[in-house]
Amino acid sequence: VVPEVNPEHIEVIESQRKRLGTKRGFIAVKSNCSIQSYVPALSPLRKYGIQNVLACTYQAISGAGKTFERWPEILDNIVPYIGGEEEKSEKEPLKVWGKIENGQIVSADSPLITTQCLRVPVSDGHTAAVFVSFEQKPSKEEILKIWEDFKGVPQELELPSAPKQFIHYFQEDDRPQAKLDRN
């Protein structure tokens, strides 16, 4: 569940309770950490008919459960492949954008997503470079306006833990940077 993108997916909780025979409690999972860097930004643009996505993710060592002290060989290094990560990063967005049928999540059929996932010498904060093709190509100004106006359920409810501006676009050419922008 990404609350700003697919809050309706909590409907599967009732099916889960029936399947497990429980009246209280449930298991809810968040999406893969790498797709959280780009799926929310693409979600409000789906109305333009996203055809293809090429995403290159630059994943911090925290995603591997490591620190620089426990993984010194990552310093001054890039690991060009993270086992299993590309497959997850190509399938999970379709699940996030999917619909609920008979208490189950049915993945979206499109877009076609291709990823390359790299581990980089950054302590915390994943980054993604994303290239998108659309059926109806929006202008840069249209995209920026959609991102500026986008509000998910947490923002509409003014939840205290929700960021006021869910999607933030940096005007600077050299941003975002994990060290400067992760918090």
Describe the role of every protein-language-model region:
Residues S62-N183:
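Charged docking surfaces used in two-component/phosphorelay signaling
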